[in-house]
């Protein structure tokens, strides 16, 4: 049995190919069933995200294994092997083990250290478990990878520094305001970036969230998801003074918030400070706002500088994370190799127990017939010794006859002959 990882990702294939190789949630059960029906596959997990599609398998090692699995993948997606072969990567044994650990830890992600991938790996694992697709070794491999990912998060700062604009904006807000529990935030826009900001803020239990957008329907959908209130763009002027933090990201070609609007808001707030984060290009907030004493304006360029610094810190943390993965991968492979001896140890124990029962029964029978107890013990010890050394003696003699010094030494080590 061999552990294997096969797949494509953002580093090896363009999005056009990744789309064609992806497994949709609706077809995942069917795909898993088809994969598990393959004669070489003992267990499998299918991981399919926007950035990667990977098969994690326990398989019977054969000469044509790679070609057989590539053929299955291509047949399932109605692709020609030559269309995907150059983009596929293939990891066996310890390379497969460390690859999954790196993926789960965010070390192989498009955004270094991003935490979402761990949840996606756990979901893929759960899907396989529901479909009875897990072999013992495969389950142990994934559980170990989850614990490694947790250790990486705990012992390094791989996820501590914002490397997306949305996360950086929220991190900045948390740094300036000690707690968001007493803060009102106004979000202007309802696109993907603002949606990510809104979800980050909800996780940090912001006191009140307002969303203003040119299209009220889109703002309303987002507001329902994150527990926010919706206002019209025209209401920003009157509502601005309520907000401690304003984060904007629209497609407007002209500024939405001007210096005069912020001056009025500050007066309404009795000049309590305001944080304004403009992550739009072109800018949503007039640059002159930065000249106001109690208004702290940050642009996307300011956030980019934060992101670059944080990415450097993540890369530094990744060095330690890679060390953890290497160590844990080696430990897991040691455990995996030890499993190959489990059956032999079990058989050896059964044989020893059978031998003990045989000689014990003979001794008890002799005692019941009135034999001398001392002689019974001596006979049992002599015969048991001869039986125990018979097979090892033959193996030692054969190794010596064949001049196999390595095997002879292995036998000596196994029998404990060189311990004194």
Curated annotation (Swiss-Prot):
Substrate binds at residues 49-52, 109, 114-116, 120. The active site is at 50 (nucleophile). It comes from the Bacteria. Keywords: NADP, Oxidoreductase, Porphyrin biosynthesis. The record marks 99 as: Important for activity. InterPro entries: 4pyrrol_synth_GluRdtase (IPR000343), 4pyrrol_synth_GluRdtase_dimer (IPR015896), 4pyrrol_synth_GluRdtase_N (IPR015895), GluRdtase_CS (IPR018214), GluRdtase_dimer_dom_sf (IPR036453), GluRdtase_N_sf (IPR036343), NAD(P)-bd_dom_sf (IPR036291), Shikm_DH/Glu-tRNA_Rdtase (IPR006151). Its EC number is 1.2.1.70. It is an enzyme of class 1 (oxidoreductase). It holds the Pfam family GlutR_dimer. During catalysis, the active site Cys acts as a nucleophile attacking the alpha-carbonyl group of tRNA-bound glutamate with the formation of a thioester intermediate between enzyme and glutamate, and the concomitant release of tRNA(Glu). The thioester intermediate is finally reduced by direct hydride transfer from NADPH, to form the product GSA. Possesses an unusual extended V-shaped dimeric structure with each monomer consisting of three distinct domains arranged along a curved 'spinal' alpha-helix. The N-terminal catalytic domain specifically recognizes the glutamate moiety of the substrate. The second domain is the NADPH-binding domain, and the third C-terminal domain is responsible for dimerization. This is Glutamyl-tRNA reductase. It comes from Sodalis glossinidius (strain morsitans). The lineage of its organism: Bacteria, Pseudomonadati, Pseudomonadota, Gammaproteobacteria, Enterobacterales. The gene is hemA.
């Amino acid at each position: 049995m061999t552990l294997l990882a096969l797949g494509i990702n953002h580093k090896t294939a363009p999005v056009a190919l990744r789309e064609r190789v992806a497994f949709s949630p609706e077809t995942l059960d069917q795909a898993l069933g088809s994969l598990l029906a393959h004669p070489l596959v003992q267990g499998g997990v299918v991981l399919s995200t926007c950035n990667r599609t990977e098969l994690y398998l326990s398989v019977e090692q054969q000469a044509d294994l790679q070609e057989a699995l590539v053929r299955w993948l291509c047949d399932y997606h109605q692709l020609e092997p030559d269309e995907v072969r150059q983009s596929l990567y293939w990891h066996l044994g310890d390379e497969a083990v460390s690859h999954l650990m790196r993926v789960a830890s965010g070390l192989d992600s498009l955004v270094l250290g991003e935490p979402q991938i761990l949840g996606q790996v756990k979901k893929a694992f759960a899907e396989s478990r529901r479909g009875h697709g897990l072999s013992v070794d495969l389950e142990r491999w994934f559980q170990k990878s989850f614990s490694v990912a947790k250790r990486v998060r705990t012992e390094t700062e791989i996820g501590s520094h914002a490397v997306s604009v949305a996360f950086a904006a929220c991190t900045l807000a948390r740094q300036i305001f000690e707690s968001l529990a007493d803060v009102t935030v106004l979000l202007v826009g309802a696109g993907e970036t603002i949606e990510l900001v809104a979800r980050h803020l909800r996780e940090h239990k912001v006191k009140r969230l307002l969303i203003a957008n040119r299209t009220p329907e889109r703002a309303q959908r987002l507001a329902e998801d994150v527990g926010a209130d919706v206002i019209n763009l025209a209401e920003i002027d009157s509502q601005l003074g309520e907000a401690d933090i304003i984060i904007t990201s629209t497609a407007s070609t002209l500024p939405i918030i001007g210096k005069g609007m912020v001056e009025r808001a500050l007066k309404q707030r009795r000049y309590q400070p305001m944080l304004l984060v403009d992550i739009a290009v072109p800018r949503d907030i007039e640059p002159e706002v930065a000249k106001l004493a109690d208004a702290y304006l940050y642009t996307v360029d300011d956030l980019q500088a934060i992101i670059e610094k944080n990415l450097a810190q993540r890369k530094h943390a990744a060095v330690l994370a890679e060390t953890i993965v290497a160590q844990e991968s080696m430990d897991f492979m040691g455990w995996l190799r030890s499993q190959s001896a489990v059956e032999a140890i079990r058989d050896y124990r059964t044989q020893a127990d059978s031998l003990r029962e045989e000689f014990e029964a003979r001794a008890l029978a002799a005692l019941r017939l009135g034999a001398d107890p001392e002689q019974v013990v001596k006979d049992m010890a002599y015969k048991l010794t001869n039986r125990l050394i018979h097979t090892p003696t033959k193996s030692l003699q054969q190794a010596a006859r064949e001049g196999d010094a390595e095997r002879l030494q292995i036998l000596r080590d196994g029998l404990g002959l060189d311990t004194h």
